[in-house]
Amino acid sequence: MEKTYDPQSIEQTLYQNWEEKGYFKPHGDASQGNYCIMIPPPNVTGSLHMGHAFQDTIMDTLIRYQRMKGKNTLWQVGTDHAGIATQMLVERKLEAEEGKSRHDLGRDVFMEKVWEWKAQSGGTITKQLRRMGASVDWDRERFTMDEGLSKAVQEVFVRLYEDDLIYRGKRLVNWDPKLHTAISDLEVENKEKQGHMWHLRYPLADGELTADGKDYLEVATTRPETMLGDSAVAVHPDDERYQALIGKYILLPIVNRRIPIVADDYVDMAFGTGCVKITPAHDFNDYEVGKRHKLPMFNVLTLDAAIRSSAEVVNTDGTINTSLDGSLPERYAGLDRFKARDAIVAEFETLGLLEKIAPHGLKVPYGDRSGVVIEPMLTDQWYVAVAPMAKTAIEAVENGDIKFVPQQYENMYFSWMRDIQDWCISRQLWWGHRIPAWYDTNGKVYVGRTEAEVRAKHDIDDAIALRQDEDVLDTWFSSALWTFSTLGWPDNVEDLKTFHPTDVLVTGFDIIFFWVARMIMMTMHFIKDEDGKPQVPFKTVYVTGLIRDEAGNKMSKSKGNVLDPLDMIDGIDLETLVEKRTGNMMQPQLAAKIEKSTRKEFENGIEAHGTDALRFTLAAMASTGRDINWDMKRLDGYRSFCNKLWNASRYVLMNTEGQDCGPNSPDYQGGEMELSLADRWIIDLFNQTVKTYDEHMASYRFDLAANTLYEFTWNQFCDWYLELTKPVLQNGTEAQMRGTRHTLVNVLEAMQRLMHPMMPYITETIWQRVKPLTGVQGDTIMLAPFPAFDAAKVDATAMADLEWVKQVIVAVRNIRAELNIAPSKPLNALLRGVSAQDKARIEANQAFFATLARLESMTILGEGETAPMSTTGLIGEMELLIPMAGLVDVAAEMARIDKQLEKLTQEIARIEGKLSNEGFVAKAPPAVIDKERAKMADLSRDIDKLTEQKAEFAKLEA
């Protein structure tokens, strides 16, 4: 093996070999069961971020683990067409390169441009997935707009329409006035803003007065421009101030519209004056109030968010109301909503109807892609009536057919599903699945798989023009079919029978409603078991938290704190990193600040760590459901872990290759084999480690599974067992050396199989080198059997004896550290309180004590026999004493301790000064203050320890 571990030299070659040889494919033998995971399809034009790297590590660990357990595994890969994101990207590119809009090109030519863009950049994320070591079946790669999935989408739409679960209606949606499309709640970013609350006077009609004699009601609003569309003023039914006015009318200023005063529990009596203007066409809460009171909806905004020349009046059932007057003042027509706001407030002031303007903090909804304020808008859209499907989907989780890990996310799921609204599935875009609906010249709608099918079904002559709906489906609609459409539905259902329901879905909590819930509903509606029972899409939903930066902030381009997983794998120099973080920014004014923080945090850039170190770090940090603060130091630590494993393997191979390693090894001479206590102990410990690892994997505790591997490999195998082999390999009999060599190669080989799911590359490399020494067959570790716990291998005696030996060695090492005695200096130990078992252990393990503790002698003191001045350690009931005379230069040690005490005392005084400074405590973040306090506590402990040592030396001096 190479002297140093260099991941760059092994990873890509290995992956290419795995892929070419078809190791990622299902092997077809279902005797141990089938196992399937569907990758959440990333945006086709996107690139890998830390969230992807995290989830892909979890999924690949599960797939590799189950594959080695003998399961017929499929990790289904694919990408999402990401309607709005992709269309915007291509539109920006078109504008920059050709100075044209999509409308200049027309729909068909623009769509060709998008497909070209997809072909050019669509492979980026799949290349990056390969770099992460993802063992997906690339031959089955799908795309949400490929021919098969498009057919599935069409089929689902038509069937839902035929089942009366899809309809077209005029309802309130999140409208993006810049992109001219409805968007989902997930694409709306609510930002905290400091705005105003305008208090307006609404005159009472018909001479009515309030209880305190006023001829108006005072309403407070953050959006005075929408008052042109008010349909009512609401008060709480129990509010005594206004009870006499319920059912009376307001004369709405500026438009002179009579609107009713209605009673509704939605109103908070304690907030403001207890009177709320109701604008059902421009506010989601008001829309619900309007439905309850059957109020007409006055839509006063155009799709560009400007004031209309006259309001569109709509009934609560979505039909147009032609009897009510929707006229609006001419002076406002065409005015942008925010300019209209200023003009309307000015007019209220002129009319003497502006009570006051107060500062007010509020959440303003912005389009996460367009960056403009989103407008609740009444538009004609297609909807899925999801309530009937939601009932079955709720029951699937209630009865345990689907489990959430961690379980707390079930509550989030239930709260959403029990308050579910119809799903708006149409988008005013060009890139996406076009809605399979056609209109005749009278506006009558026909739904079918194709225009030909529509004409045949409804007997429409070719001479009659039909126009296909211009809208496309919400991206989440096709994603909702992901588990069954990718397996061949509706045409080919063989794979569906094999791999569905899938086993686990790995996803973030933020899309439980948008994706997870909709997959459950759609799958259970369309996929049934042979007995007709609705089939779930997956048995377990493993919910991950977000990966945040080291300070706990969400990673975002605008913050300049995004980390690219590939930069941690391959490394990146500082200048390239700065350019990457500050180039092509939406907000270029932030570039200088981002450059400064990047140069401070990564003054030498980021060094290459390799895929295995990154994967292991992500697994080790995967505590269920919690957000993770990224920690570069842990990544550095796990890179060192890879080095440790590499160097340990080199030690094993240097001592075993070309040697007799016992039965099954190529150089076995047929002699006897004797296992040392250390050999028996490591075999037992490895066996127990396998059991613990399996338990953690079964409960999706990847962090505990990773820590189990780390503890065994570094702390037990490397730090203890390899050291314990040295006395045997140097001075043992032939049978003992054969036994230790046999144990070394067999445990190392099995360790690679145990670690492989999390660290695929380094383990394959080491396994290929060590397997010939064990007689193990197989072309790749990927298909080798996963280690299994064997109750017959439990060796409690070896475990207890060796742990006792370790305690003795640790006690001696601690004494050396405390007294500053060189590790190479031989020591003589005295023992008191020695049991018969202790005595037997001492006699049997002299070689270990001589080599690892550098004990020249171990003398048992007789009863009542006194010992010279010694420093002691306890091992159970046995006392270990090291006579101190002649071991140390007492004066030099006392001087050293005094010097250390002085330094520590000064440091404590410095921190105390800091913490007593009121200015520092007031300004410093709590985390910084806690860190300083923890540092002071550590220093105090160090002072106590040194003071004790000084007292011991003082006794010697006396």
Curated annotation (Swiss-Prot):
<comment type="similarity">
    <text>Belongs to the class-I aminoacyl-tRNA synthetase family. ValS type 1 subfamily.</text>
</comment>
<dbReference type="Pfam" id="PF10458">
    <property type="entry name" value="Val_tRNA-synt_C"/>
</dbReference>
<dbReference type="InterPro" id="IPR009008">
    <property type="entry name" value="Val/Leu/Ile-tRNA-synth_edit"/>
</dbReference>
<dbReference type="InterPro" id="IPR033705">
    <property type="entry name" value="Anticodon_Ia_Val"/>
</dbReference>
<feature type="coiled-coil region">
    <location>
        <begin position="887"/>
        <end position="956"/>
    </location>
</feature>
<dbReference type="GO" id="GO:0004832">
    <property type="term" value="F:valine-tRNA ligase activity"/>
</dbReference>
<keyword id="KW-0067">ATP-binding</keyword>
<dbReference type="InterPro" id="IPR010978">
    <property type="entry name" value="tRNA-bd_arm"/>
</dbReference>
<keyword id="KW-0030">Aminoacyl-tRNA synthetase</keyword>
<dbReference type="GO" id="GO:0005829">
    <property type="term" value="C:cytosol"/>
</dbReference>
<keyword id="KW-0963">Cytoplasm</keyword>
<dbReference type="InterPro" id="IPR001412">
    <property type="entry name" value="aa-tRNA-synth_I_CS"/>
</dbReference>
<keyword id="KW-0175">Coiled coil</keyword>
<dbReference type="GO" id="GO:0002161">
    <property type="term" value="F:aminoacyl-tRNA deacylase activity"/>
</dbReference>
<dbReference type="Pfam" id="PF08264">
    <property type="entry name" value="Anticodon_1"/>
</dbReference>
<comment type="function">
    <text>Catalyzes the attachment of valine to tRNA(Val). As ValRS can inadvertently accommodate and process structurally similar amino acids such as threonine, to avoid such errors, it has a 'posttransfer' editing activity that hydrolyzes mischarged Thr-tRNA(Val) in a tRNA-dependent manner.</text>
</comment>
<feature type="short sequence motif" description="'HIGH' region">
    <location>
        <begin position="42"/>
        <end position="52"/>
    </location>
</feature>
<dbReference type="InterPro" id="IPR013155">
    <property type="entry name" value="M/V/L/I-tRNA-synth_anticd-bd"/>
</dbReference>
<dbReference type="InterPro" id="IPR014729">
    <property type="entry name" value="Rossmann-like_a/b/a_fold"/>
</dbReference>
<dbReference type="InterPro" id="IPR009080">
    <property type="entry name" value="tRNAsynth_Ia_anticodon-bd"/>
</dbReference>
<keyword id="KW-0648">Protein biosynthesis</keyword>
<dbReference type="InterPro" id="IPR002303">
    <property type="entry name" value="Valyl-tRNA_ligase"/>
</dbReference>
<keyword id="KW-0436">Ligase</keyword>
<dbReference type="GO" id="GO:0005524">
    <property type="term" value="F:ATP binding"/>
</dbReference>
<feature type="short sequence motif" description="'KMSKS' region">
    <location>
        <begin position="554"/>
        <end position="558"/>
    </location>
</feature>
<dbReference type="GO" id="GO:0006438">
    <property type="term" value="P:valyl-tRNA aminoacylation"/>
</dbReference>
<dbReference type="InterPro" id="IPR019499">
    <property type="entry name" value="Val-tRNA_synth_tRNA-bd"/>
</dbReference>
<dbReference type="InterPro" id="IPR002300">
    <property type="entry name" value="aa-tRNA-synth_Ia"/>
</dbReference>
<feature type="binding site">
    <location>
        <position position="557"/>
    </location>
    <ligand>
        <name>ATP</name>
    </ligand>
</feature>
<protein>
    <recommendedName>
        <fullName>Valine--tRNA ligase</fullName>
        <ecNumber>6.1.1.9</ecNumber>
    </recommendedName>
</protein>
<dbReference type="Pfam" id="PF00133">
    <property type="entry name" value="tRNA-synt_1"/>
</dbReference>
<dbReference type="InterPro" id="IPR037118">
    <property type="entry name" value="Val-tRNA_synth_C_sf"/>
</dbReference>
<keyword id="KW-0547">Nucleotide-binding</keyword>
<comment type="subunit">
    <text>Monomer.</text>
</comment>
